[in-house]
Amino acid sequence: MIDQKVIVALDYDNQADALAFVDRIDPASCRLKVGKEMFTLFGPDFVRELHKRGFSVFLDLKFHDIPNTCSKAVRAAAELGVWMVNVHASGGERMMTASREILEPYGKDRPLLIGVTVLTSMEQSDLAGIGLNVAPQDHVIRLATLTKNSGLDGVVCSAQESSLLKNELGKEFKLVTPGIRPLGSEQGDQRRIMTPLEAVQAGSDYLVIGRPITQAVDPAAVLQAINTSLTK
């Protein structure tokens, strides 16, 4: 099977609407991301419904806690059978290492474990507001390096950091990029954005795209256009 680069971010407060959308797209064309709102509303059974329909799921809950608690949450995600799960890199090396180690018994069936660096909505002024007098890119590099040293599979980062991180951390270190907007779509609340082709050319491995697909009149056609653009 082709390794789909597009991850569609589901953003619904109604489960029926979410599943109605999912039934309009092909599991071969993308993966799906389930975040905090949907998981809190609908729980693990919603993820199981997506699995029944043939989709791989990125469980985007950004765990951040003491090592014991965080690692057990990651193990619960593995038990659920998700393809990818993430933790906040700012939780530190011990937290990330514990989360990686708890997945070892799952072998090849384990989910990818990804670190979250700097949220794409954050600018330098936001970092300064929490006491970090550093440019977003510099902080991303610091946290991404810590993530790799902790043995994780990759990081979530903006496309602007992708090229630099690929060079710094190697081609095998996966880069998951939100803030992706196909040409002609609105910027929304993501501050650091790039088109799908630009992001892949910069080094991103997986592209998180939400409203430009979920709110499209023909989401399957939008997915096809994006995937076609990535093969040029």
UniProtKB/Swiss-Prot annotation:
It is an enzyme of class 4 (lyase). Keywords: Decarboxylase, Lyase, Pyrimidine biosynthesis. Its EC number is 4.1.1.23. The active site is at K62 (proton donor). One of its GO terms (cellular component) is cytosol. It comes from the Bacteria. GO terms for molecular function: orotidine-5'-phosphate decarboxylase activity. Pathway: Pyrimidine metabolism; UMP biosynthesis via de novo pathway; UMP from orotate: step 2/2. Gene3D superfamilies: Aldolase class I. Belongs to the OMP decarboxylase family. Type 1 subfamily. Catalyzes the decarboxylation of orotidine 5'-monophosphate (OMP) to uridine 5'-monophosphate (UMP). Homodimer. This is Orotidine 5'-phosphate decarboxylase. The lineage of its organism: Bacteria, Pseudomonadati, Pseudomonadota, Gammaproteobacteria, Vibrionales.
